[in-house]
């Protein structure tokens, strides 16, 4: 009799995705981040569900309800901080996952890559809306500043912003709809993640060498299940260390002050994982130009497959491209630092140089160096 695992319609899907899946024998720890993102998403949905049981999306009570969760609800504090820091872990894994894709040429799988970009946008939107919910100072002013960017769109901008706000300023209507969207989006992300996997399993995984691994496959279980479990344990170790020892390390002290439309905080800034994009936005003195640069800073990923000029897929055997890649990483870290600094000299010029360098590396230097490397191999 054939194993039920291979015949039952539901079990068969699980089996072909996580058990009998043929996987390359040489994929490194950089391939762990997909499963870690899945764990982060499940963790965020679960902690978020328990938070939603006690949270009220009303301007008068939102801040108090979060305080109530932390003070009065059984283990409410740990649920709240796991959710807040879980978002940080989510983005760390996301950046590593995208970085891996760039380094090893995973973007050659176009459908998988493009759905990944949609997932990135959806996750960023969800995180932004979630940051508004505690209704602290940074929640309110962050929501005001970021939604206001849409007013830069010609002709329809102002109407669009007021439509999103549900009024003439960020208020009760805005908070209620942000809560509704923040609740539904993770489920949309989960559905998209399944489509992401569906397209990945059409082609099979890439591997560090960038060479086809069809002749050397191993079953996903037990080799990569045990490897994923190790990754998950390390993720939980880092997350729980953060939650239990310094839960507010990555947060903003301003968000412990209730939202006040009459008092603007000295430095409005988003969570750390948006600072690189925020720095790019601020580095352009024109409002519409800044918004376009902000959108393009992420959307540029969609152009990467068309800018791939190398004869090799991976950067594993391309030392010049490797140098550029790590320069890009350093540049993104610089942008992240600048995004958290006040708009004054010398931070303005550093941010502008770093922003120009970011687009130059991706659009000009990477394709050029790849062509040079191709020519160096003709000997």
Swiss-Prot record:
Location(s) in or outside the cell: Mitochondrion inner membrane
InterPro entries, from UniProt? Cyt_b/b6_C, Cyt_b/b6_C_sf, Cyt_b/b6_N, Cytb/b6-like_sf, Cytochrome_b, Cytochrome_b_C_euk/bac, Cytochrome_b_N_euk/bac, Di-haem_cyt_TM
According to its UniProt entry, this protein's organism is Canis aureus
Q: Which CDD domains match?
A: cytochrome_b_C, Cytochrome_b_N
Which GO MF terms are attached to this record? Answer: metal ion binding; ubiquinol-cytochrome-c reductase activity
Q: What is this protein called?
A: Cytochrome b
Where along this sequence does the record place binding of a ubiquinone?
Answer: 201
For this UniProt record, give its keywords in alphabetical order, as a comma-separated list.
Electron transport, Heme, Iron, Membrane, Metal-binding, Mitochondrion, Mitochondrion inner membrane, Respiratory chain, Transmembrane, Transmembrane helix, Transport, Ubiquinone
The chain's disulfide connectivity reads none
Please share what else the UniProt entry notes about this protein.
Heme 1 (or BL or b562) is low-potential and absorbs at about 562 nm, and heme 2 (or BH or b566) is high-potential and absorbs at about 566 nm.
Assembly behavior: The cytochrome bc1 complex contains 11 subunits: 3 respiratory subunits (MT-CYB, CYC1 and UQCRFS1), 2 core proteins (UQCRC1 and UQCRC2) and 6 low-molecular weight proteins (UQCRH/QCR6, UQCRB/QCR7, UQCRQ/QCR8, UQCR10/QCR9, UQCR11/QCR10 and a cleavage product of UQCRFS1). This cytochrome bc1 complex then forms a dimer.
């Amino acid at each position: 009799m054939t194993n039920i695992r291979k015949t039952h319609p539901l079990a068969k899907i699980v089996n072909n995705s996580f058990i009998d899946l043929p996987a390359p024998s040489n994929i490194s720890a950089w391939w762990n981040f997909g499963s870690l993102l899945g764990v982060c998403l499940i963790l965020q949905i679960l902690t978020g569900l328990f938070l939603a049981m006690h949270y009220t999306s009303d301007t008068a009570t939102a801040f108090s309800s979060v305080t109530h969760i932390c003070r009065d609800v059984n283990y409410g504090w740990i649920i709240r901080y796991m959710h807040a820091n879980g978002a940080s872990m989510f983005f760390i894994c996301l950046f590593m996952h995208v970085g891996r894709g760039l380094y090893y040429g995973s973007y050659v799988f176009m459908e998988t890559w493009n759905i990944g970009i949609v997932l990135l946008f959806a996750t960023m939107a969800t995180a932004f809306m979630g940051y508004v919910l505690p209704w602290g100072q940074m929640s309110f002013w962050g929501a005001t500043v970021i939604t206001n960017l849409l007013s830069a769109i010609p002709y329809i901008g102002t109407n669009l912003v007021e439509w999103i706000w549900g009024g003439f300023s960020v208020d009760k209507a805005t908070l209620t709809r942000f809560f509704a969207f923040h609740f539904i989006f993770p489920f949309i992300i989960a559905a998209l993640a399944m489509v992401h996997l569906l397209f990945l399993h059409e082609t099979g995984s890439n591997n560090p060498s960038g060479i086809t691994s069809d002749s050397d496959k191993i079953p996903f279980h037990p080799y990569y299940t045990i490897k994923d479990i190790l990754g998950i344990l390390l993720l939980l170790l880092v997350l729980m260390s953060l939650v239990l020892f310094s839960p507010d390390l990555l947060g903003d002290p301003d968000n412990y002050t209730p939202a006040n439309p009459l008092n603007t905080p000295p430095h409005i800034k988003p969570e750390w994982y948006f600072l690189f994009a925020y720095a790019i936005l601020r580095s352009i003195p024109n409002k519409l130009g800044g918004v376009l640069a902000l959108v393009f800073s992420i959307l540029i990923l969609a152009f990467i497959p068309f800018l791939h000029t190398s004869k090799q897929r991976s950067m594993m055997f391309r030392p010049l491209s490797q140098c550029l890649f790590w320069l890009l990483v350093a540049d993104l870290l610089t942008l992240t630092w600048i995004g958290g600094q006040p708009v004054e000299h010398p931070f303005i010029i550093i941010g502008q140089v770093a922003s120009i360098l970011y687009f130059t590396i991706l659009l000009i230097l990477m394709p050029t160096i790849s062509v040079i490397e191709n020519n160096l191999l003709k000997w």
